[in-house]
């Protein structure tokens, strides 16, 4: 079974061109299923899988405390895997028939108000190279709506500061050109001039924009650790995740009159329905404003 999973992952890399993070997610999901089957019964041939095996796996995942979102992702990964095996002639039937994806409550993105954004963006210690780097990263995230993966993968050739934009390769290897505001440009230029040269190390010749204290490119996990520290320092009580500034970027644009198609393009969403969730956020925030300030609310 593990060999078949390896073949599938290779197919996703070579034929589908999926990102490393997506490949890892598929790998984790499928090996989680295999580990369950190892405790359930001996599985040597995927063609012996039945609907009851999938139902049992879903029950097992729920019992382990997996969220409906996680279970839905497992089911999606298995569907893709079995479809590949059937197309490749390694399975003759689909055990996923009549398996329904668990319904998920749609959670709205967590968004910071403008005061909290200011607190967060001013909480880095800019007297140090690492502090300047951190402020520049946060300013760019809020100014552009980049995903964290896109941020840490930025290279020097992606910056076009004199022209006022940056370019990035997003999901599906799609290139985006994103304007960069004056504040973010100023902070980024200061980081590049004063801090980045101090973080570079001769042994690591890379052109990543944002470097760690070893002179290597930052990872998503490294950024997450940095963000947690800054969020704590800011005193903001709301939970803040790496996606919070992206959500805030989109919501604040819509609140100030940006059209949905433009926000979709800036975020790099393939489907506008993904962007539409932010319109629900702005409606809820308008209701809060109404309740707070209208005399008869």
UniProtKB/Swiss-Prot annotation:
The active site is at residues 147, 171, 243, 246, 269, 278. It comes from the Bacteria. CDD domains: INT_XerDC_C. Keywords: Cell cycle, Cell division, Chromosome partition, Cytoplasm, DNA integration, DNA recombination, DNA-binding. It is found in: Cytoplasm. Residues 1-86 form the Core-binding (CB) domain. GO terms for biological process: cell division; chromosome segregation; DNA transposition. Its main location: cytoplasm. Residues 107-291 form the Tyr recombinase domain. GO terms for cellular component: cytoplasm. Belongs to the 'phage' integrase family. XerD subfamily. Site-specific tyrosine recombinase, which acts by catalyzing the cutting and rejoining of the recombining DNA molecules. The XerC-XerD complex is essential to convert dimers of the bacterial chromosome into monomers to permit their segregation at cell division. It also contributes to the segregational stability of plasmids. Forms a cyclic heterotetrameric complex composed of two molecules of XerC and two molecules of XerD. This is Tyrosine recombinase XerD.
